[in-house]
Swiss-Prot record:
Keywords recorded for this protein, A-Z: ATP synthesis, Hydrogen ion transport, Ion transport, Transport
Pfam families tied to this protein: ATP-synt_ab, ATP-synt_ab_N, ATP-synt_VA_C
Domain of life: Bacteria
Origin species: Clostridium tetani (strain Massachusetts / E88)
InterPro entries (UniProt xref): ATP-synt_VA_C (IPR055190), ATPase_a/bsu_AS (IPR020003), ATPase_F1/V1/A1_a/bsu_N (IPR004100), ATPase_F1/V1/A1_a/bsu_nucl-bd (IPR000194), P-loop_NTPase (IPR027417), V-ATPase_su_B/beta (IPR022879)
Protein purpose: Produces ATP from ADP in the presence of a proton gradient across the membrane. The V-type beta chain is a regulatory subunit.
Record protein name field: V-type ATP synthase beta chain 2
Database matches in NCBIfam families: PRK04196.1
Keyword Ion transport: yes
CDD domains according to UniProt: ATP-synt_V_A-type_beta_C (cd18112), ATP-synt_V_A-type_beta_N (cd18118), V_A-ATPase_B (cd01135)
SUPFAM superfamilies to which the protein is assigned, alphabetical: P-loop containing nucleoside triphosphate hydrolases
One GO biological process term: proton motive force-driven plasma membrane ATP synthesis
Sequence similarity: Belongs to the ATPase alpha/beta chains family.
PANTHER family documented for this protein: V-TYPE PROTON ATPASE SUBUNIT B
Length: 460
């Protein structure tokens, strides 16, 4: 028999404070019945003596201190999961919002999950093909990796996310029926939601997609649980159904802003730029749920997207994210201004696990050499551009002029590709050789003579 409590101490924003509670646990879910008979959900976020602080998942409008009844369920937030979640859409606490009814299963799953034992982790290998040359060739996404995309306000990260969801497929000989995408949207606008849904329906990928949606006008408390519900679903599909899951979460910045707002409501001591001191560990509790496990066939790969405030890569959100994840894909406003899509700035971008998931048996034997040469050559192009701004392009040496041509071709043909352009890894590497062949053979010092003999298409 559950005990019910009447009379609240205080209502402050999304928080409710209750006194004289007994046997209550942290993170426990509560049911709140207000005077008009409406029932809301909340969770315990703080315990001090006999006082409990509760976050309400919906608005606290209409709650009075005298006529509100609270009962504790004795359980954390749990969601029902089965393979039937594929093709469905849910809100941030795992409730179906697509009008097709609830998911029924014999077992419910705690959205907080649990970290994978390091001893049980399997080293990530095998790449996931996104169909985007700048990612597949230069910052390869490896199965089981966590690789964030650093973007900025007004940049085409929504289009990039939609394109990856439409085009992504696994390599290594596993069937496509074992691959699915879990998409978590946090604090997005209504028109962004309609954009995603329209693109997914047009591409026919709904049947291998699970959506968790928290809109900008939805409760911020729900924004905190959205990625956790999505990752719990991914863990179920990966480790109980044996599927390979790509989790795309956007926008992590909105999640962190919600965390800061709730921390402020709880009157916690702020850290850098007002964010709570536990921001690092909180983000780690999300990112570290990616990976592969020994004895399990499935995998979870994360591609979180965050918008850097003022394009500042040293801001706490991208800064702390970079410490936890295994690289980053950085979008450039300068490239976007040149109408290059996707505007991936390859020089600060990095995939730390790329080296172990490419090459013969994974992609192609020349992949690593081509990638290294493109990085080196494009880096030198930036030096040549800086020099040309001082002395003028006409005064450059003949070799430097060739590098300028290489840089223009690299940006316009390799980095730039249409929203509907889906390139295989072989097409990407062949295109890379075509552009590298603009340079003299003597300048291609990052590739082996055998690779040059086989793939070089220039005259020298």
């Amino acid at each position: 028999m559950r005990k019910e409590y009447l009379l609240l101490d205080r209502v402050q924003g999304p928080l409710v404070v209750l006194s004289e509670v007994e046997g209550v646990a942290y993170d426990e879910i509560v049911e709140i019945k207000i005077a008009n008979g409406e029932t809301k959900k909340g969770r315990v976020v703080q315990l001090q003596g006999d006082k409990a602080v509760i976050q309400v998942f919906e608005s606290t409008t209409g709650m009075s201190l005298q006529n509100t009844t609270i009962s504790f369920t004795g359980k954390p937030l749990e969601i029902s999961l089965s393979r039937e979640v594929l093709g469905r859409e849910f809100n941030g606490i795992g409730e179906a919002i697509d009008g097709r009814g609830e998911i029924y299963s014999l077992k419910k799953y705690n959205v907080n999950g649990r970290p994978i034992n390091p001893v049980a982790r399997k080293y990530p290998r095998n790449f996931i093909q996104t169909g985007i040359s700048s990612i597949d060739c230069l910052t390869t996404l490896i199965r089981g990796q966590k690789l964030p995309i650093f973007s900025g306000n007004g940049m085409p990260h929504n289009e990039l996310a939609a394109q990856i969801i439409r085009q992504a497929k696994i390599g290594g000989g596993d069937g496509e029926e074992k691959f699915a995408v879990v998409f978590a949207a946090m604090g997005i606008k209504h028109d962004d939601k309609e954009f995603f849904r329209k693109k997914f329906e047009e591409a026919g990928v709904i049947d291998r997609l699970v959506m968790f949606t928290n809109l900008a006008d939805d409760p911020i408390v729900e924004r905190i649980t959205t990625p956790r519900a999505a990752l719990t679903t991914a863990e179920y599909l990966a480790f109980e159904e044996g599927m390979h899951i790509l989790v795309i979460m956007t926008d992590i910045t909105n999640y962190c802003e919600a965390l800061r707002e709730l921390s402020s409501s709880r009157e916690e001591v702020p850290s850098r730029k007002g964010y709570p001191g536990y921001l690092y560990s909180d983000l780690a509790s999300l990112y570290e749920r990616a990976g592969m496990m020994e004895g399990k066939d499935g995998s979870i790969t994360q591609l979180p997207i965050l918008t850097m405030p003022n394009d500042d890569i040293t801001h706490p959100i991208p800064d702390l994210t970079g410490y936890i994840t295994e690289g980053q894909i950085v979008l450039s406003r300068d490239l976007s201004g040149k109408n290059i899509y996707p505007p991936v700035n390859i020089l600060p971008s990095l995939s730390r696990l790329m080296k172990d998931g490419i090459g013969e048996g994974y992609t192609r034997e020349d992949h690593a050499e081509v990638s290294n040469q493109l990085f080196a050559s494009y880096s030198y192009v930036q030096d040549v551009i800086s020099l040309s701004q001082v002395i003028g392009e006409d005064e450059l040496s003949p070799v430097d002029k060739i590098y300028m041509e290489f840089g223009r071709e690299f940006e316009s043909k390799f980095l730039n590709q249409g929203f509907e352009d889906n390139r295989s890894i072989d097409e990407t590497l062949d295109l890379a050789w075509e552009i590298l062949s603009i340079l003299p053979k003597s300048q291609l010092d990052r590739v082996s003579p055998e690779a040059l003999e086989k793939h070089y298409r220039g005259d020298k």
